[in-house]
């Protein structure tokens, strides 16, 4: 059990450690990052703001997203990484109705106007809400995201020479991508 420096003060949590992980280390103007390949070919990204920056700073800047979306990144180096990740379980429920309405999708929420006749002809129906719930959990057994479970895999070219410590002991951003398309993006402020 080690301290995690949350915005509300230090908390004790269990960290998972992987020493001398051979992987690419990425960096941007205000962050460092590593990614792990998951069993299905997806990637789990860990993006740590540099000292003096917050997750909000990195999210607002958007450079991290350019890195996640690209196959090659100019600030990338094959290294040995001592990775330390806290176990975490984050979930979120988002009301999508407001977003749909702002995009002009309103009829489906209006009684008498919604047309779901292809689904049911017996009675007129309409939607009263649209919500998305997401849960991402990471522990020694792997990554669970939404309704599927994936486990880290490994492959490696020639061993790197440089070694760095990448310790996620303060708020960080995570992302799960498939074919460079983000499936989940979140922040961990309190594992």
Annotate each predicted stretch with a short phrase.
Residues 1-191:
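Hydrophobic-core positions in well-structured secondary-structure elements of globular domains
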């Amino acid at each position: 059990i080690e301290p995690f420096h949350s915005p509300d003060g230090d908390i004790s949590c269990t960290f998972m450690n992987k020493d001398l992980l051979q992987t690419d280390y990425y960096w941007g103007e205000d962050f460092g990052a590593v990614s792990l390949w998951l069993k299905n070919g997806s990637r789990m990204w860990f993006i740590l703001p540099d000292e003096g920056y917050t997750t909000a700073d990195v999210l607002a800047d958007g450079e991290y997203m350019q890195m996640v979306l690209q196959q090659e990144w100019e600030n990338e180096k094959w290294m040995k990484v001592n990775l330390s990740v806290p176990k975490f379980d984050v979930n979120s429920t988002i009301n999508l109705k407001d977003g749909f309405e702002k995009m002009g999708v309103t009829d489906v929420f209006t009684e008498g106007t919604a047309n779901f006749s292809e689904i049911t002809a017996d009675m007129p129906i309409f939607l009263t809400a649209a919500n998305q719930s997401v849960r991402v959990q990471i522990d020694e057994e792997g990554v669970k995201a939404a309704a599927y479970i994936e486990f880290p895999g490994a492959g490696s070219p020639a061993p790197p020479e440089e070694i760095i410590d990448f310790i996620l002991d303060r708020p960080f951003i995570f992302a799960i991508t498939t074919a460079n398309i983000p499936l989940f993006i979140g922040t961990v402020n309190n594992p």
